Amino acid sequence: RPQLGSKLREVESRGIEMMLVVDVSNSMLAEDFQPNRLERTKYAIDKLFDGLKQDRVGLVVFAGDAVVQLPITSDYRMAKAFARRISPSMVSVQGTDIGQALSLATMSFSEKGDNPAGRVIVLITDGEGHDSGAIEAAERAAEQGIRIFTIGIGTPEGAPIQIGGEFIKDDKGEMVVSKLGEPLLEKIAQATDGAYIRSTNQSIGLDEIVRTINNMEKGDLAALRFEEFNEQFQYLIGAALVLLLLEFLLLDRRNP
């Protein structure tokens, strides 16, 4: 039915805030997960949003640098659209600076209110980066009551990295094999009362995190404004009838 005009209404909700922090370095293109680590991650994130209720989500992507791809929002449709566009080209500097990514995510939550929502960071990476301040960043997050759940994607055996049909090689001309690095991810989770989960081709591990989040204490989220359309069906019908009546009267005058 036709809808015209709009109105705004405020909706109070209770839930948690979650920042997804996704590794988009070239090593995430390794194919020990199908079709590769990054594409498998994007698929899992898409499904994650289907399992959330009144929670708010944001997205940080990182490699050697970190970028807020999506600020905290309750619009899951928008979040899905942004997550589907994730690619290594979003970050100009290659590498895996987990510390910078965690620091940026920590600063990207909304401000606390009187009854703040629980805050969670979900870090998805193959863990190949150096420490580079990651533990310190995790400890700072813990001081603010933020829990970090880490998901390791990849296999201990690893896989080569293919870009544009060619495999990446090192300075010696040997093929680079990217392997899952778990110790750092375990330490980050332990520092924040979170948990580390090793992904498999069957399950990235986000389902387990959703179950944990759903059992967390909820807090007040900022009032959300939704734009709604007013039903105008009856007015359009009325206008159409008036136009038809005028046309009938004009024709009647022309044909006495």
Which residues fall in each region the model found?
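C-terminal signal-anchor/stop-transfer transmembrane helix together with its immediate cytosolic
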Residues: 1-10, 215-256
